[in-house]
Amino acid sequence: LERVLPVIGCYADTIVETGPLGSAHTIKLLNNFLALATGAVVGEALAAAMSLGVDLSVFDAAVRTGGADSAMYRRFAHWALEGDDSHFQATMRIGEKDLRYYRQMADAAELPTAMADAATQLYRLASQLGHARQFMPVLPSILASLADGRERALPRRE
């Protein structure tokens, strides 16, 4: 590991020794699941706030002072508040793929996947509605439009 650290450091922001061969992949899948499931919850909450007419800046102030604040919330909030989806440049299609890999690992170990299944449904729905290439932070706008019928502008990425 010591010999390759300088090379890995050229393209990795964080390097964590995870243990035996294969453990890094397992941890990556777990981390991606946690981030994507959180993103799905954040997306649904922001969509509800949009559809209910909540002042998003007030909602944001409340979230940032409580336990719901997270890196994923902040990445999605940039879109909801400023129309900037660049803070998490992963597409709905990538979300589906990463959750599928997590579910395969969990299924093989006979672990529950209820949250992974629910998150997968939201990213798959966005993809099926024609937004597979959209970055994940626009999920709230897609879900809000579906719920209330009001069209919301999305980045031109299709």
Predicted features along the sequence, with ranges:
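A charged, well-structured terminal subsegment
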Residues: 5-18, 93-99, 153-158
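Rossmann-fold dinucleotide-binding core
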Residues: 1-36
